[in-house]
Amino acid sequence: MHVTLYKLGKIPIPPKLYGGTERYIYWLGQALIALGHRVTLIANAESHLPGAELRTLASDEKNPQAWLNLIPESTDIVHFHEQPRGPVSKPYLLTIHGNGRPGEQFPPNTVFVSRRHAANHGSRRFVYPGINPDDFRFSERREDYALFLAKASWKVKNLQGAAAAARRAGLELRVIGSRDWPLRLQRWLPRIRGVRYYGLLGRPEKEELLSRARCLIFPVRWEEPFGLAVTEALVSGAYVVATPYGSLPEIVTPETGRLSTRMVELAEAVKHPQQFSPAACRDRVLRGGFTHLDTARKYLDYYERILTRGSLGEDGEPAPATKPGFMAKHLLPWGNGA
C-alpha cells in the first residue's frame, strides 16, 4: 500500500528537540516501511524519514491550493495529522491529536488517540500513538529523582502539584522544559526548593534522564488525549504517578504506577518505589499495544476499511463532534493539601 503521511508545519519530522506529534508521525512512518509499505512524507523541508519520499512546499509558495499537488498520484490513502486545507480527491484518514472546541465537527474518517479521547468527541475509533522501544534506554537500576515532562506553561499540566508531591516524598524533581515557556516561568523554577530545571533538552539527554529516573510525575488537570511522555517513561523503566484523567487509566496499571487526584497519595507512591518493577513498566508498552508497530497495524486495518467501504462509519452514523459543553482546559479537581 502507498501511504502518504501529511503534517506541514514549522517543526520538522522527526523534531530536533520538542515535538511529540512529529516524533510519533516519524515512528509511524518507520513502522509502515518496516511492514513493507511505501510511504511519502509531506512535511517541513528539514524533515527526513529513511526509506520514504519527502515532499514539501516552497517557502515562498503563494498558491493556497499548492498542497494538493504534493500528494502523489500513486497514493492509495492520505493520512492527515491536521485538518485538510480543502477538499481531497484521494481517500484519506484524519488523526486528531488534541482536544476540540465544544461542538466542533470532524470528517467521518477521523480517528482519535485514546478510547476516552474518542468518546469526548462522539466516536469509538482510536489508535494509541505507539513509540519505537529501540529509541529508549532501559535499566533496572534507578536513581533517586522524579521527572516532570510536560508543557509546564499550561496550568492543566500542574507543575506545582508535581513539585509538591516530590517534595513531600523527599525526592528531587527534575523538570525538562519546552520551547514556549515564558521567561518568568524559567526564572521562577530554579527558586523552588527541590526542583532542578533543565530547560529544553535534545533526545539523547532526555532519554538518559528517563533511563535513570525513579518515576514520572504527571498530575494533569484536564482530559489528557494521550500523553506520550507516559509511555516514554514506562518503556524506559520508570513508573508513573498521575491523575486519573483522560487516557491515563488506559495506560497506567496498578503494576506500573498510581492514579489519584490527591497529592498525598501520589507522594506515597513516589516514596515507595519497591512496589513497582522497571521490567513490568517496560512490558506494559511492549505487550500493551503501545509500540509503533502496534499503531501501524491498527491504522492499516482502518486504511483497508476506507479503501474497501469508502468510510469508517456505519450507514447513518453521525460524524464525530466534540461534546457540547466540553471545555478542554477547564481545571479538573486536584487535592493539594494533606
List the predicted regions and their residue ranges:
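A short hydrophobic beta-strand element within the catalytic core of glycosyltransferases
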Residues: L216-F218
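Conserved acidic donor-binding segment of nucleotide-sugar-dependent glycosyltransferases
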Residues: T253-V264, V270-Q275
